[in-house]
Amino acid sequence: MPSERQKYIRNFCIIAHIDHGKSTLADRLLEKTGVLTSREMQEQVLDNMELERERGITIKAQAVRMVYKASDGHEYIYNLIDTPGHVDFNYEVSRSLAACEGAILVVDAAQGIEAQTLANVYLALEHNLEIMPVINKIDLPSAQPEVVKKEIEDVIGLDASQAPMISAKNGLNIEEVLEKIVDMIPCPEADEKAPLRALIFDSFYDSYKGVIVYIRVKEGTLKTGDTIRLMYTKKEFLVTELGYLKPGGLSPADELKAGDVGYIAASIKNVRDTRVGDTITLVENPAKEPLPGYKKVNSMVFCGIYPADGSKYGDLRDALDRLQLNDAALTFEPESSVALGFGFRCGFLGLLHMEIIQERLEREYNFDLVTTAPSVIYRVTTTDGDVIEIDNPTNLPPVTEIDSMEEPMVKATIMVPTEYVGNIMDLSQERRGIYKDMSYIDEGRAMLTYEMPLNEIIYDFFDALKSRTKGYASFDYELVGYKESDLVKLDIMLNGEIVDALSFIVHREKSVARGRRMAEKLKESIPRQMFEIPIQACIGGKIIARETVKAFRKDVLSKCYGGDISRKRKLLEKQKEGKKRMRQVGSVEVPQEAFMSVLKLD
C-alpha cells in the first residue's frame, strides 16, 4: 500500500519522436504549475546545452519537480524526468524510464507514429509503465487527430479515446494534461523503512560540489550525513548535500524518502564512479540485491580525432577530459598515426553521439580537428584460435593469421510512406541488409524490418534514407549480435607508402568499387606536386585500383630553337631523372579535405 505521502507523488517522463514537441510540452507544464514565470521562460528549458537547443534534440536526461493543485483540492508533486529521444542514448532512456511509474506519449497530429516513438513505447512497456497518450500540434492545418488516435490504437494497442488534444506551442488544453496525470499515472508504492535502494539515472559534474548524482529512491530513506555505497562500483561516499531538482538549480532538503526523485552531492571526484543504472544503498544497513537492469555501456562506433595543429595535443586531452566529466559513455585513448601525428582513438555510443562530441570540441573549445573514418568493433578469430576485438583497422593482424572475422549486426526498423518502399528496399540491399518483415501501419505508411551490418549504417545511411524518401522516412536500430562475414582491409598507398589514417575494413564484394572510388576522390583532392604521385588501393599485396596525380612540368625546351633532336632528348632525359629522384625523397602532404572527401564517398 502506498503511504499517505506517496499518494500525492507522480513520477513520469515524456516520450516522443524527435520534433513531436516533447520539450515544448515540458516547458508548458513548468509554466502552468508556476515553477517558472513567463518572464523566465525560454524555449526548451530542460535542454541546457546550446547544441541541444540548436538541433532541437535532448542529449542529457534532466529532471524537475513541480507542485500542482488539482481540481480535487489536493496538492500533488510531479517529478518530470526528461529523456533523450535518440537511439544512441537508448540506455540512458531505459534508466530514466526505470525511475518513473508512467510515461506521457506525445504524438504529432500531422505526422503520426514514427520509428522512435515505437522504440521508446516498447521500452516503456518493458518497464511496466502506464502510458498516457497525448496528441500535440492540433493547431496545424495538416493535423488529423482522429486518424492519429486510430493509429495509436492499431499500432501500439493503447486506448486513445480519452487522449488530450493539445497544442504545446500555444498552450492549448495543457490543464487537461495536468489533470489526467493524477488519474492515469500511478503513485509510487514502496516501503520507507526498508534498507535503502536508489537508482542513479544521471550525473553531472559541478566544479564546486564535485559530481552531482540524480537519483530515484525506490525503497528506504536517505539523509544528509549518511554514508552510501554504490553496489556495482563498490565505492563509498559521505552524503554532504541532498535535495530536489528545479530548473536551472537545486533546492536542498534534509531527506529523500521512497518514491522521491532528487539529487545527492557527496564529494565524488569522477563521473565514472557513478554509473547510470547503479544502485545506491547505505553502508550501515545495506540492501541484499541491487536494482535490476544495470549494464555497462559499451562504445559502438570508434574514430581517430587529431588536432590539425600538432602542438594542441595537450589541449585536446584536457578538452576530452572535461567532456568526459559529464559523459561517461565517451571513451578515449592516445594513438599516433604516421600521417596525422598524435591524437586520440575515441569511442562513442553511435553516430549522433560522435557528431555531437566533435561539434562540441570545435565549438566550445575552438579546435580545428582532423577525424578518420568511423569504424565498429570487429571480432577476429586468429589461426591459433584466439579471439581478438579490433576497433582500429591498423591493428588488424596480417591476412595469413586470420581464420575468420565477425561484424556487429543491427535490427533496423524503417517507417516510410508506401510510395517509397521500393527505394528503401533497394537501399537496404545495397547496404547488405537481410529482409525480415514488412507490415502496413495504415493505408499510406509501411514498417520495414531489416537485419544489417552496423558498418553499413555508420557512414551515411541516414542521409541516403532521407534523400530517397524526400525526408519522410524515420529509422531506428538496435544491436542483435555478431555474424561471420567476408571482410578485408583496404589500404591506400600514396607514392608507394601506406597512409594508415585512410585504411578501413570493408566487405570483399564492395572492396574493388570502394577502392576505385577512393582513388578517384583522392586524385581530385590532392594538389599536384613537382613529381607525379601514384594513388593505389590495395588489399593485402594486391593492387585493385590506381590513379595518378600528374606532375607540374617546366618547359626545358624553351631555349632550343630548332637544332639537333638529340640535344632536346638529353634535356628531357635529365628532367626525367630529376623527377625520379624527387619522387624517391618527396613526401606527399594530404590535406584535411582529402580525408573528408573519402568519408563522403557515396
Curated annotation (Swiss-Prot):
Which residue ranges does the record assign to the tr-type G domain? 7-189
Name the source's superkingdom: Bacteria
Concerning InterPro entries, the annotation shows: EF-4 (IPR006297), EFG_III/V (IPR035647), EFG_V-like (IPR000640), EFTu-like_2 (IPR004161), G_TR_CS (IPR031157), LepA_C_sf (IPR038363), LepA_CTD (IPR013842), LepA_IV (IPR035654)
The record's annotation in PANTHER family points to:
TRANSLATION FACTOR GUF1 HOMOLOG, CHLOROPLASTIC, TRANSLATION FACTOR GUF1-RELATED
Q: Quick check: keyword GTP-binding in the entry?
A: yes
Broad class of the protein's primary localization: membrane
How this chain sits in the membrane, per its record, is: Peripheral membrane protein
Q: Where does GTP bind?
A: 19-24, 136-139
Output the Gene Ontology cellular-component terms.
plasma membrane
GO biological process, alphabetically ordered: positive regulation of translation
Q: Name one Pfam family in it.
A: EFG_C
Report TM segments. Answer: none
Q: Which NCBIfam families match?
A: lepA, small_GTP
Q: Does the keyword Cell membrane apply?
A: yes
Q: What is this protein called?
A: Elongation factor 4
GO MF, any single term: translation elongation factor activity
In short, the EC number is: 3.6.5.n1
Q: Which PROSITE patterns match?
A: G_TR_1, G_TR_2
> What family does the database annotate?
Belongs to the TRAFAC class translation factor GTPase superfamily. Classic translation factor GTPase family. LepA subfamily.
Q: Which function does this protein serve?
A: Required for accurate and efficient protein synthesis under certain stress conditions. May act as a fidelity factor of the translation reaction, by catalyzing a one-codon backward translocation of tRNAs on improperly translocated ribosomes. Back-translocation proceeds from a post-translocation (POST) complex to a pre-translocation (PRE) complex, thus giving elongation factor G a second chance to translocate the tRNAs correctly. Binds to ribosomes in a GTP-dependent manner.
